[in-house]
Amino acid sequence: MAPQPLKVGTSKLSKMVKSAPKTAGKAKKRAVEQVSEESDEEFGDQGSGIDMSDDEEEVDGDDEEDEDEAFPEFDSELEDNDQEEASDEEQDEQDTSDESEIVEEDSDSESGYNTSDIERMYASDDDLSSEENKDLPVDEKLSRLIAKNTVKPDDSIGTDDKISRAKEGVGRLVPSKHVKGSFVREYDEYEAGYGSESSTEDNPNTVGNIPMEWYDDLPHIGYDVNGRKIFRPLQGDELDKFLANVEDPSAWTSAEDKLLQQNVQLSDKELDIIRRLERAENPDADFDPYQPTIEWFTGEGKERVMPLSAAPEPKRRFVPSKWEHKKIMKIVKAIREGRIIPNKPSAEKPRFYPIWSDADQHNPHVMYMPAPQLPPPKTAESYNPPEEYLPTEEEKAEWEAMDKEDRKTDFLPEKYDALRKVPGYKNLVQEKFERCLDLYLAPRTRRVKLNIDPDSLIPKLPAPKELKPFPIASTVQYRHPGDTRVRSVSTSPDGQWIASGSEDGVVRVWDLGNGREVWRWDLHAGPIQYVEWSPSREESLLVALVAGKIAVLSPLALVAPHIAAQTLTHSNTAFATSSATTKQGAGNEVKGIESVKWTRPSERERERGVLVYVEVPGTPKQVTWHRKGDYFATVASDAANKSVLIHQLSRHGSQSPFRKTPGTIQRVAFHPSKPHFFAATQRYIRLYDLAAQKLIRTLQSGVKWISSMDVHSGGDNLIIGSYDKKLAWFDMDLSAKPYKTLRYHNRALRSVAYHPTLPLFASASDDGTVHIFHCTVYTDLMQNPLIVPLKILRGHKVIDGIGVLDLRWVPGKPWLVSSGADGEVRLWCS
């Protein structure tokens, strides 16, 4: 309730008059007269208090005159005060009458103690007996007044039987339930509304401003004003909400009351406020954003012409400051000493906070040792482990029968189809306890880590300019008519001629130096699959492969006479023997391969340099010569068990080294110094001993499909290319797996080749590039081969997804010859 207004009574005013003689006089008399009239009316209404008679008023007036004579020094001050207050007397009387009306209204509507009641309780007997004060002189009155105000008040004052002095007629008195013989006053209930000062709106849930999540696990949501639980209202699911939004039009104008946990309908006024906020307007409908401007200080007749201060400017405004000069000199000294750097570029702040930075880590103590890390979880600890990790019934029984110290694990793996179905781990507390024991009881040791520079682990490769010479540019181009695809290319052992086989069925011989075509053979048997020069320098033999036929050729007019004679003797000797025929020679050595026929070409073809035809099953795709130049092997993947054939030119004999092929043979090669034979299938490379007729070893390529193969001149290293864009280097003294697997081409590799004498090798791919590498093979078995990338040669065009098809090194020179699907053969020189 609002505090009750206090009304000054007569008794208290008399005390004020006695205790403050300086304010005596006319002003005091006016105050006494005004208050006495009000107090008399109030005392009359209450039926209590002290009434003053006319005689007492006259006595008071006499006392005042005596006081004026006794204290003449106050007269002048009182007269001045009377003059100053005379003008305010009328206003004071009017204010006093207004206050009396307000006091009367408040006294009718409120109960409790009045000021007059309080003063009456604390009034002394001397104040009530005015008869005794009449005869006392002024000095005695002053002495009593001083003595009264210097004595401790009596504690027993106000302890009378009447506890409540509320006005009669307000409320009703009922016997007290707690104190016998006492009464308490009951009042009517007051309904609080919007006009009330204590409450604005009744809310049945009185929990206050707390998170309602605290009641999520309880059936109720709070308590009412009487302490009873407010149970949670029924909540519909998402389907109910959807139906309410569809069927109930009022659902769109309701909001959820989080305190009551139910939807409350918004009033029209609240909806209007929401609409205004959505339109970015003022929520008050009566607000006028375009009201006229009120010119408080700039309107007509309201200009400020007088300055706020007309004091003259001080001298310090025109004299340089001494203290600023000292501060500036300190800054100048700091700049000269370098402690302050002017125009220092500000350090760029990081855009993102470095959460992994070690800058904020403190240096640990010298004796600090970090705790060992927990081992990472294993597959058996998964909530959904594979079936092989789940124990059987026998294993479960065996595990349960074992002691805890003998068990390998403290748990049995279990399988759950969802993480939410995994129960609590019962050994969690025990494991954490044992972890804590290990942390503060188990001794720790510090392991010294090897400080190895990562750069030292990377091999230091020499610069490419130190490994010259190697091919770097295209110097000569050998263009084929019609841009026909050139599938194969080969160089003569003397390095003077280049042979190429194209899809138009023509074998061409080119001059290496000037790029002129000097010889050609049209075999009329379809595309030329492969061409290969014999490695023997004493002869000039060229083998070309077409569908179902092998052609042994020689450009006799281009070579020296003694070389031409040796070539003819070597190729035609078997025809001169008695066992030789025009269809098949050395028939005793061709057991099981009657389909292979050595035939002699016509006279006209022999004049053009066609020496021998060999009819073979299937379509041979690759040919390779033995280092002596008498044997050569062919591969026809579509010939089943006769896919690999080894032919002897001097005896016109052919034989199949395999009774049953170990897969689809892709490439074959002779060992450069031993009677060994390499056969590459799609994924494996097998090494055979031809003399002992046995398998020596099998190399695992690690690729999906081998496309090409070449053997190093030393015989202990091998490279292969694959259609899955990989090149693998094998060190057969090291392992059966690749020593290096390189993937640098963007498309399939078509050909790889070692240089016969120099430490170089190259690879060709369908991406139209040729990569040149330096390779040094050391005689020391403890040292690995050195591989250094040197150059990427670009020049061939990619036609229908096919780029460079074949490449060969020029013997004795760091030059490379390549052929592509664009109908060009290019010579790359250093």
UniProtKB/Swiss-Prot annotation:
A molecular function (GO) term: large ribosomal subunit rRNA binding
Biased composition (Basic and acidic residues): 131-142
UniProt xrefs under InterPro entries: BOP1/Erb1, BOP1_N_dom, WD40/YVTN_repeat-like_dom_sf, WD40_repeat_CS, WD40_repeat_dom_sf, WD40_rpt
Superkingdom, taxonomy of origin: Eukaryota
Disulfide feature: none
Region (Disordered): 1-142
Keywords on record: Nucleus, Repeat, Ribosome biogenesis, rRNA processing, WD repeat
Main subcellular localisation: nucleus
Oligomer status and interactors: Component of the NOP7 complex, composed of ERB1, NOP7 and YTM1. The complex is held together by ERB1, which interacts with NOP7 via its N-terminal domain and with YTM1 via a high-affinity interaction between the seven-bladed beta-propeller domains of the 2 proteins. The NOP7 complex associates with the 66S pre-ribosome.
Similarity comment text for this entry: Belongs to the WD repeat BOP1/ERB1 family.
Protein name: Ribosome biogenesis protein ERB1
Species assigned in the record: Cryptococcus neoformans var. neoformans serotype D (strain JEC21 / ATCC MYA-565)
